[in-house]
Amino acid sequence: MALILERDGRACVWCGRAIDVGLVEATTEHVVPRIKGGPSWIENEVAACRRCNGQRGHLTPGEWLEECERRGWQPNRQALVRALTALDTAIKTHGGQRRARNYARSQLRRLTRAS
C-alpha cells in the first residue's frame, strides 16, 4: 500500500481528500474490478479513501469519475489514465487477462475522450 500511496500523492484518486492522515483511512482499490477480471497487480490498484472505495460499488471507473465530479469532488483523472495505461502495458508483458485488457482499454478510451 505504501508504494501506491506514494505514487498517487497520498490522496484519494476519486475525491481528492488527503488519506492515511487523521480520520481518512487509506485503502487501495482495483481500477478494473476483480469481478471483471482485474488482477491484483500494483498497476491495477489506486489509492482511495474508504468512503469512495465502498460507494463506487459496481460502477465503471468512467461512471464513478463522473459521479465524483457531479458531487463536486476533485477526482484525479490523470492518475486513473496512468493506472489504466500501466495495466495495459503490464498485461502485454505478462500475457493473459483478456477480460481485464478489454475492460481497461474501453475505460481508457472513455477517460481520454472526455478530458
Regions found by a protein language model. Give the residues of each.
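Histidine-centered nuclease catalytic patch
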Residues: G16-E45, G62-E67, G72
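Short cysteine-rich loop/turn motifs with clustered Cys
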Residues: M1-A26, C49
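A detector for short metal-coordination/catalytic motifs
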Residues: E43-N44, R51-S115
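Generic anion/oxyanion-binding catalytic loop in active/binding sites
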Residues: M1, R34, G38, N53
